[in-house]
Amino acid sequence: ASYEALGGFVRNWPGKRIGVIGGPGDRRDEDFVSLGELAADIFDEIIIKEDDDTRGRPRGNAAELIYQGVEQFLNQGKDFDSRVIYESILDETSAINMALDRAPFDSLVVILPESVSRAIGLIEARNPVKDLELSESNLKSSKSSEELKTSIVH
C-alpha cells in the first residue's frame, strides 16, 4: 500500500522518473514480484538492488524476483511506456550512484534504501542544492524555523 501511495506522486512527475528499488530478504517471493510490477508501472528507469543483509536469501534471489515482476508487467500488453529501462545492480551504493549519474536536471530519483544514512551521504556528496541558503530573513518569515528546515530535508 505504501508503494502504491508513492506511485501516485511519482506518476505525476513531469520529468524522468528513476527508481532504485529493493526490499528486505525476509519478504515473500510474491511481494518481490509485486514490487517489480509496481515499479514498471511507475518509473521510466529501474535499477534493482539488494540489501547488504539478505536476511537468509541467496545473494541475487530477491533482485531476480523483482526483475521477474518488471518483465511480467511489461509483457502484459497494457498501456505503458515501452521505453522502460531496467537492470540489476546488486550493490546499493553502486545502484544509487548509477541512478544519480543518469539523472537529468528535471528528473526525480526515488531510492528505497537499506541504509538511509548511506543514501543521504551519497546524495549530499554531490552538493545537489548548491544555491539554497537558509538566511535569517527566510527563517523569520516562516511560522517555524524547524518547519522550514524539515521541509528542505524531506
What kind of region is each of these model predictions?
Residues 1-154:
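ATP-dependent carboxylate-amine ligase
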